[in-house]
Amino acid sequence: MRQIILASASPRRKELLKQLIGDNFLVYASSYEESPCPGMHPKELLLKHSAEKARDVAKHFNSGLVISADTSVFFNGELLGKPKSSEEAEKMLKLLSGQRFLVITGLTVLDLDSGKEISELKSTTVWMDKISNEQISAYVRTGEPLDKAGAFAVQGKGAAFVEKIEGDFFNVVGLPLFRLGKILQKAGVSIFEEGLS
């Protein structure tokens, strides 16, 4: 079994990876600090952040596969990451209310043994119901939106606002499991091997 390292402190990504391959992986959070890159297309920026997180963590290991991801909401040509305050969360939710938008994840798998790096973008379309200002305020008070891209959690109370999803549901949570499973299997990881779960 190859060593797998998840380059993320996200409890949601940890749970998703566990769902796919069981407990046989390490979690090593990246210290890479995301910064704006003027002139870079938002989608390219997600790929850059994902790859840089993987490379940062890779410096601490000699062998194995490093998995990293960066997820944001893409609406009107802009990326909506995690809100920095309750006010920003409310603003994001008002913007997305009644709209169709994309949730995009930059996914990177870095093979430390071969040096091969795979970085891809995965997109999922989300339709959000119209949300009243009262609902938005009540939801923000729960604290749930404050560490979520686009200020909502489809796997939490935010599901009450999501009318429809087209594409990989797990991508909206933060890790596109279908595509990741394919990449891991190509790298020699048997996700169906006995003893992995």
Swiss-Prot record:
Enzymatic class: hydrolase
InterPro entries: ITPase-like_fam, Maf-like
Keywords in alphabetical order: Cytoplasm, Hydrolase, Nucleotide metabolism
This enzyme's EC code(s): 3.6.1.9
Localization annotation: Cytoplasm
Site (Important for substrate specificity): R12, T71, Q155
Gene Ontology MF terms: dTTP diphosphatase activity; UTP diphosphatase activity
GO biological process, one term: nucleotide metabolic process
Family of this protein: Belongs to the Maf family. YhdE subfamily.
Role, per record: Nucleoside triphosphate pyrophosphatase that hydrolyzes dTTP and UTP. May have a dual role in cell division arrest and in preventing the incorporation of modified nucleotides into cellular nucleic acids.
The protein's name: dTTP/UTP pyrophosphatase
Organism (species): Methanosarcina barkeri (strain Fusaro / DSM 804)
